[in-house]
Design a protein with these regions (language model features):
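Short loop/turn segments immediately following the C-termini of beta-strands
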Residues: 31, 39-41, 46, 80, ...
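Blade-level signature of beta-propeller repeat domains, shared across WD40, Kelch, NHL, RCC1
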Residues: 240-274
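Glycine-centered coil/turn sites that cap beta-strands in beta-rich domains
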Residues: 275-300
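Short loop/turn segments immediately following beta-strands, especially the blade-tip
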Residues: 51-55, 99-110, 155-169, 213-222, ...
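Signature of short aromatic-glycine-proline-rich micro-motifs recurring in repeat-based ectodomains
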Residues: 12-28, 68-76, 126-135, 182-192, ...
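Conserved beta-propeller blade signature
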Residues: 33-37, 84-88, 142-145, 152, ...
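Residue-level detector of Asp-centered blade-edge/turn motifs that repeat once per structural unit
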Residues: 28-31, 77-82, 137-140, 194-198, ...
């Protein structure tokens, strides 16, 4: 058990260190280091516990200024480069940090990092999120940001250090006007999870859960397809306030954590297999005169 008196963690209340020690976003990197965001009013540190049991700490700066992060969310490791870490700041100084640790996570002196709290979408509209509740990266390396009023994406082609460009997905009204509305623009987005087919499961605070897919047309545009929308009325969701979503990658089972309990749904997308060492075929053997179904598992 790691506490302020026996670790590198700091308490929000120095006079009574065992009273309140806040940690967020714990995760292990590929080197076996445990990353912890140790936060509070006057504590803005990243703490790292090495495999050798040593605690290291450093602050994050952006353009020479130390960035306070009193209420950070999870740390999302970039799929393109594990040295890149995305850290959303949920409330109080709301924004998004990209940290590049240069492969030396216990040495903050050679890092580069940037904090942004303002973006402009494809139509030139300014976005300054009041709250950021969720962050995810899909298989195309697009960053999805869920806020208190809708969501936006940062395409993989955008250099976060050089540009504050983003995109907001548009749902066409199909009423002959060629007009559309931003996807879930009035919803609080509590969570975003990407499944094995690169579809997005989105949990909202008041409208249940959505499963959407992005289909690229011949002109390079993006069409948003709503595959499913689960609510209390049409499913077994115990509440329309979906706080968290998790997927069992090997089976595709989707778990919904709501304000009134937990429920799961068996979806049809699993993560691709790295090899074919665990193939399951039934029936086996298959004889030439067999006319029934053939089941093969382990290809994806």
């Amino acid at each position: 058990l790691h506490l302020p008196h026996n670790s590198g963690l700091e308490s929000v209340v120095p006079s009574d260190p065992d009273l309140y020690t806040r940690t967020d976003g714990a995760m292990f990197d590929e080197q076996g280091n445990l990353w912890v965001l140790n936060t509070g009013r006057n504590i803005d540190n990243i703490r790292i516990l090495t495999p050798q049991g040593e605690w290291k700490s450093f602050h994050i700066t952006s353009r020479g200024t130390r960035i306070p992060f009193h209420t950070p969310g999870e740390i999302v490791v970039d799929r393109r480069n594990t040295q890149w870490k995305w850290i959303p700041l949920c409330r109080e100084n709301t924004g998004l940090i990209l940290l590049k640790d240069n492969g030396t996570p216990t040495n903050g002196n050679d890092d580069s990092s940037l904090f942004r709290n303002e973006w402009f979408d494809q139509n030139g509209n300014q976005i300054i999120p009041e709250f950021i509740y969720s962050l995810a990266q899909d298989h195309d390396n697009t960053i999805w940001v869920g806020t208190s009023r809708g969501l936006f994406t940062i395409p993989a082609t955008v250099d976060f250090f050089e540009s504050n460009s983003c995109e907001r997905l548009v749902i066409l009204r199909n009423d002959g006007t060629n007009l559309g509305d931003y996807l879930l623009e009035k919803e609080q987005i509590n969570c975003i999870v990407v499944d094995g087919a690169n579809r997005k499961w989105i949990g909202t605070a008041a409208s249940g859960a959505f499963l959407i897919d992005i289909v690229k047309d011949e002109d390079g545009g993006k069409d948003v397809e709503t595959i499913a929308h689960f609510t209390m009325e049409n499913s077994l969701l115990p509440s329309d306030n979906v706080l968290s979503i998790a997927i069992q990658e090997s089976t595709g089972e989707v778990f919904f954590g709501t304000s009134e309990g937990l429920v799961s749904y068996m979806s049809d997308a699993v993560e691709p297999a790295e090899d074919f060492n665990n193939l399951y075929i039934y029936p086996n053997p298959v004889y030439p005169n067999y006319k029934g179904q053939l089941v093969v598992k382990g290809l994806v």
